[in-house]
Amino acid sequence: MPSEHPFSDGISTPNPKETMNDTAQITAGYGRRYIVRTPDGTTYEASTRKKRVDFACGDRVRISPVNAEQVVIEDFLPRQSLLYRQDAWKTKLIAANVTQLLIVTAAVPSPSVRLLQRALLAAEAAGIRAVIVLNKADLPETALWLEKLKFYETLGYPVIETRVLENADSLRPVLQGHSNILLGQSGMGKSTLTNALLGSQTARTGDISAALDSGKHTTTHARLYDLNGETQLIDSPGLQEFGLHHLQAADLPHYFPDFRHLVGQCRFHNCTHRAEPGCAFKAAAETGAASPERLAFLQGITDELLG
């Protein structure tokens, strides 16, 4: 089984004994400045103690008042999930307590298979359901990209088509009942989809941007919205890379739906799935039961983590 999550001390079912009058949820953040919302719907500007930055959009936190408009975040409550990325130099928390990741992609501008596969891997590692959203599906360039995405449907990842000029209603049943996050490259239409889903709430986003001194750069930080009483949506900044250095190489096969059933079936328990005889992974790729490209991806990520 996969190793213990590096943030496992903060992932569990929230304690029902926590009092509600001193708790809030982070709905936006930039650096060490945050916007939090209490259970009664009141929003506050928030700072942290001792320059802490280990908070994420979606975190439920304990707060202490500073004045009528400001509070201090004391700590986060136990997390149900944590989505983050890590390269060789730094860790970037993306969102906490999400139950569903929607990877927004489109044929234009040029989509990244590398980013898609890495985001899917991160979702598997975090125990978060992943959905692929094919936006701008009415573009003529879409057909070839859709054909490539159909492979991921065979792995169990739904592919939902949306069109920028429509109202994103095809997404609403998928989002319902989940704490969702939209993630993808810049230019894929995440914010446009968010605005379509929010409708009349869109005009309120300027207040948060002003509070964070972010001006017009409304996609430089993650932001959480309530779509209804049971559904939340986080719009996140566009990204080009998704570091996976927080994962353990030995755990990787568990995060591949196309290979996890083969774990333990190789002749050697320490098989690297390369040149060893009796490798179940290699056999699956050679017979067409699994994709050779996916095996190469697994090998590449393994090398990256061990390098």
From Swiss-Prot:
Its EC number is 3.6.1.-. Its cofactor is Zn(2+). This is Small ribosomal subunit biogenesis GTPase RsgA. NCBIfam families: ribosome small subunit-dependent GTPase A (TIGR00157). Pfam families: RsgA_GTPase. Monomer. Associates with 30S ribosomal subunit, binds 16S rRNA. It is found in: Cytoplasm. Transmembrane segments: none annotated. Keywords: Cytoplasm, GTP-binding, Hydrolase, Metal-binding, Nucleotide-binding, Ribosome biogenesis, RNA-binding, rRNA-binding, Zinc. Residues 1-21 are annotated as: Disordered. InterPro entries: G_CP_dom, P-loop_NTPase, Ribosome_biogen_GTPase_RsgA, RsgA_GTPase_dom. Residues 10-21 have a biased composition (Polar residues). GO terms for cellular component: cytoplasm. Zn(2+) binds at C266, C271, H273, C279. Belongs to the TRAFAC class YlqF/YawG GTPase family. RsgA subfamily. It comes from Neisseria gonorrhoeae (strain NCCP11945). The gene is rsgA. GTP binds at N135, K136, A137, D138, G184, Q185, S186, G187, M188, G189, K190, S191, T192. Residues 85-242 form the CP-type G domain. Binds 1 zinc ion per subunit. It comes from the Bacteria.
